[in-house]
Amino acid sequence: MIAADTNVLVRLLTDDDAAQSAIARSLFLAESIWISKTVLLETAWVLRSLYGFDEAAIRGAFGKLLGLKNVEMEGKPSVAAALDLNGRGIELADAMHLSGRPPGATFVSFDKALVRRARRAGVQGVSGPALTQ
């Protein structure tokens, strides 16, 4: 099994370096691949910041990776749930936080926009912190 780093995924998804992209493709064709959540998040950041990918393009690319039989992802069900939430208007990193929480846990954030987006998307158990003194 190969644990892929961000740069391997970026080469695979952008084909921006002919030699490295060919190696990345051959790895994905020949090996079992492990992808961590942190690598996914960093890959999303690189694709958005340096390559101009929008959320839909990133979601589509990650969805294809999820569907590959030889690819295992850390927390695969929560990654799939995060991609669904992302499609409903929640930023990918926030969606990963929401989908990765333990069952029944309330997600608390000072980010009022995130709380509103989560509620609009139908996510239960999301709130701002109760401020007491």
Locate the predicted segments by residue:
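Alpha-helix C-terminal capping segments
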Residues: 24-31, 82-86, 97-104
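Alpha-helix/helix-capping structural signal
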Residues: 7-8, 38, 112-113
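Acidic catalytic patch
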Residues: 37-40, 59-88, 116
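Short, well-structured N-terminal submotif of metal-dependent ribonuclease cores
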Residues: 1-35, 50-60, 121-133
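Acidic, PIN/NYN-like endoribonuclease modules and their adjacent C-terminal/linker elements
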Residues: 68, 85, 98-99, 103-133
